[in-house]
Amino acid sequence: RNFPVGLEDTSTYPNLISFFEENKIKIEKSNMSFSVSVAGTNIEYCGKGIGGIFSNKINILNINFIKIFFEIIKFYKKSSTISVENMKNETLGSFLEKENLSKYFVNFHIIPMVAAIWSMPPDEAKQMPLNFFINFFKNHGLFKLKNRPQWFTVSNRSKTYVDKIISQISGEHYKNYPIKKIIRNKENIKVYYGSENEFFIYDKVVLATHADEALSIIENPTKDEINILKNFKYKKNFDVIHSDN
């Protein structure tokens, strides 16, 4: 089954949208929302209206909780006007401290949002370069309190454009071949697959996979390949797939 895990808006991803239009790949409106639920506390809310903010009714009487949303307005308005040209060495965490923002806002809003978008632990979220954070939020309209961009996803999901690309390839194509290793020599490149030590022979090979996977299948990688590919960090991530009525 295909799940819509990729979302995009038309202004931020013009090349991707052009690709969809050129290949007559249909997209449909989707919803990208943000919610927080902190285990062991009464903190629970989402960004959709008063009912979403006070999804846990007990927080109607929680002054610290209510202050979060006033700080959101203040922080978003200020951040949307900040020039980050001279802030290359500043982190998000240090900026939040300078702004004297409450722990409720930091721990229950902005850090969870950053951690969710980039799939990172809260401590690492605070170490994010401020200029990267500001530019990303500006480009994606996330500082806007109103009129945020409409998000879209591919109709029938990624299989649609994968099949479209494959149909346009003039040569042979093979799917579901587990690549074991790639060996280069002066004459050609051998791509080994499966359990029987079978291989394809090519003049050139392009690896369109994650850096750690690429490094693991390249036989005798060069020093440059090792130095570049080993610096990409990965972590296991836990996702919850759900549907709402």
Question: What positions do the PLM features span?
Answer:
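Central helical "cap/lid" subdomain
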Residues: 178, 184, 191-245
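Glycine-rich FAD pyrophosphate-binding loop
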Residues: 1
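Short, well-ordered alpha-helical microsegments
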Residues: 16-17, 162, 214-215
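Short acidic-glycine loop/turn motifs at beta-strand connectors
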Residues: 38-41, 186, 195
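Mobile amphipathic helical/loop "lid" adjacent to a hydrophobic cofactor/ligand pocket
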Residues: 7-135
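A residue-level signal for conserved active-site and pocket-lining positions in enzyme catalytic cores
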Residues: 20, 96, 114, 165, ...
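Helical element adjacent to the flavin cofactor pocket in flavoenzyme catalytic cores
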Residues: 133-193
